[in-house]
Amino acid sequence: MFPLRALWLVWALLGVAGSCPEPCACVDKYAHQFADCAYKELREVPEGLPANVTTLSLSANKITVLRRGAFADVTQVTSLWLAHNEVRTVEPGALAVLSQLKNLDLSHNFISSFPWSDLRNLSALQLLKMNHNRLGSLPRDALGALPDLRSLRINNNRLRTLAPGTFDALSALSHLQLYHNPFHCGCGLVWLQAWAASTRVSLPEPDSIACASPPALQGVPVYRLPALPCAPPSVHLSAEPPLEAPGTPLRAGLAFVLHCIADGHPTPRLQWQLQIPGGTVVLEPPVLSGEDDGVGAEEGEGEGDGDLLTQTQAQTPTPAPAWPAPPATPRFLALANGSLLVPLLSAKEAGVYTCRAHNELGANSTSIRVAVAATGPPKHAPGAGGEPDGQAPTSERKSTAKGRGNSVLPSKPEGKIKGQGLAKVSILGETETEPEEDTSEGEEAEDQILADPAEEQRCGNGDPSRYVSNHAFNQSAELKPHVFELGVIALDVAEREARVQLTPLAARWGPGPGGAGGAPRPGRRPLRLLYLCPAGGGAAVQWSRVEEGVNAYWFRGLRPGTNYSVCLALAGEACHVQVVFSTKKELPSLLVIVAVSVFLLVLATVPLLGAACCHLLAKHPGKPYRLILRPQAPDPMEKRIAADFDPRASYLESEKSYPAGGEAGGEEPEDVQGEGLDEDAEQGDPSGDLQREESLAACSLVESQSKANQEEFEAGSEYSDRLPLGAEAVNIAQEINGNYRQTAG
């Protein structure tokens, strides 16, 4: 019985070991079990694979997820091929069970996040192919547990940077593919340039290991990077109000601001760490971008258009929207410029405030201890609900204030009583009635103020100090805040309108001890007003009530090129903050149109005139040369020389000088003459030599005359700058003739 059971057990084990899923092909070859499941349209890792399989091919399928436990039954796999799939997710622990894995191919997939911690169990890995994926980062210690890795392929991914020392632990690495990654060539990648120059690892296509950013270095190979001005961060921390000494207690109720300035290249990122009695608070300042500014500008324009529509269409008023209650003022606010705002100091905000700056080259930090005095009343009266009365920061109120008709806010004018509706005053003297609305007791208490604040309040009668906006600010369309002792007012000035922006530092004002308003009643908030007056003082031209949740106010209908002042004050009190500004001068539209038209006309006419002038110059013919033929009287000297050397005349004279041959006895005279000539030649008769020289001179003279005749037309031209050769020939002839005569005499 026992042998039968043992036999059955062996058969079962062999059957399980030899089973193979239906779409796959399993082959036992050279003591290795191959499972070929490629090109089978699989969407999951198949189950039921042989437990002793060593090579598993799942390439060219449609697998999207590698789930944890998918390879739990094939732990002896040494080669896993998963290329050309649709893998997007690799669950942590899916590959950690393959401790004997030597070759892993995950190329040509859609992996953007990989569980690098699984590689810690794959210490025998020799080949890792992760190319043609969507990897955006490679942790510094991701490959630290792969001492036998020889070939690493991470090309054609989305890697922007690599941490220094990423490849230091790969002692057996001989082949590395890094090309076609969008590297950001900043200070964090300088190490790669030095490492590539000194390593013995093969780096194929070094020219393709190039920068994608910044734009100035786009396309530059990493090994050709220029020297970059890199510096670690340095941090400077200051407080406002300033601390007289470290640990000096501050009075409760104050607004406290810490300014953190960090220098370094690249620009450091800031982080606030607050150790307060309630625990540790970590704050990250927001990052500003040009797109956000553009959206904000568009929203501002929409607000102005809505105000204009409300003022012009008073006959068909729209119902007021139900705005949500403004959020509570936050305890801490990290600003984009590196500052930290504590709107209301109390014992809960005491502690250690640390500003930490870090960039690619390191980190630095500095701290300051803030102590709050336990005694003393708060400087500003808190509002209802335990929160300070005022607006939240601009970033917190932006969504609440958007679209409100806050150019001028509703108020009860003189002669109006409860139950007769409200009036909206845009410019003093012009009112628009609105339907009667139900108001709460708090709003009724706020409306029971001066009948017309403009008649009682005059700008310039309060604090004598003024804060004048400069000309450069008025010429700009940007909001540039001016920080004062009691608050912040930001102005955006145009030709016929001005925008006033209030920020949180001017949010908690209450009536002063000597103010007209006296002490506020319980449950009533102090009323704050904005006045727009002429710069020289006098009654307000426009005014508006400062509402909670509204931080932008538009004053319209102003005169171009006029000086105005904006006064921020509490009802019945003197002006706390006053800003003097000038509206822009309005340029007539007709003048602009004429100037632009003239400029365009000149711009279009000048090239045409230049082309016409060039055409006329090209078509104008040049002045032609004229040939002038002038007859010349024959020179008697030339005639005589020609006659003297005429061979016909010499022949006739010889006929006359010598008698006929019959008379002289035949041919003897000629022989005698020839003999005489020979004798003269032998004796060197000077007269014969002179005659030969004279004949040669005459021949040369005739040749010079023939050459002069050939150039007669050129010499006689009106525009010729050459001397007539005829005159030179005459002079030479006279000289030769004179010499000849002297010799003959």
Swiss-Prot record:
Q: Name one GO biological process term.
A: positive regulation of axon extension
Spell out the subcellular localization from the entry: Cell membrane
Q: Which domain of life is it from?
A: Eukaryota
Task: Spell out the residue ranges making up region: Disordered.
Answer: 287-326, 375-466, 656-722
**Does RNA-binding show up as a keyword for this record?**
no
Organism whose genome encodes this protein: Homo sapiens (Human)
| Keywords, alphabetical | Cell membrane, Developmental protein, Disulfide bond, Glycoprotein, Immunoglobulin domain, Leucine-rich repeat, Membrane, Neurogenesis, Phosphoprotein, Repeat, Signal, Transmembrane, Transmembrane helix
Q: Where are the transmembrane segments?
A: 590-610
Q: How does it assemble?
A: Homomultimer. Interacts with NTRK1/TrkA.
Q: Which residues form the LRRCT domain?
A: 181-232
Taken from the record's topology, the Cytoplasmic segments are 611-745
Q: What is the protein name stated in its UniProt record?
A: Immunoglobulin superfamily containing leucine-rich repeat protein 2
Which InterPro entries has this protein been placed in? Cys-rich_flank_reg_C (IPR000483), Ig-like_dom (IPR007110), Ig-like_dom_sf (IPR036179), Ig-like_fold (IPR013783), Leu-rich_rpt (IPR001611), Leu-rich_rpt_typical-subtyp (IPR003591), LRR_dom_sf (IPR032675)
Disulfide-bonded cysteine pairs: these are 260-355
Record's Gene3D superfamilies?
Immunoglobulins (2.60.40.10), Ribonuclease Inhibitor (3.80.10.10)
- List compositional bias (Acidic residues) regions by residue number: 290-306, 431-449, 665-683
Q: Name one GO cellular component term.
A: plasma membrane
Domain LRRNT: from-to ranges: 19-51
The job of this chain, per UniProt, is described as: Required for axon extension during neural development.
- Ig-like domain location is 233-371
LRR repeat boundaries on the chain: 52-73, 76-97, 100-123, 124-145, 148-169
Short name of any one Pfam family annotated for the protein: LRR_8
- Topology term for the membrane: Single-pass membrane protein
Q: Which SMART domains match?
A: LRR_TYP, LRRCT
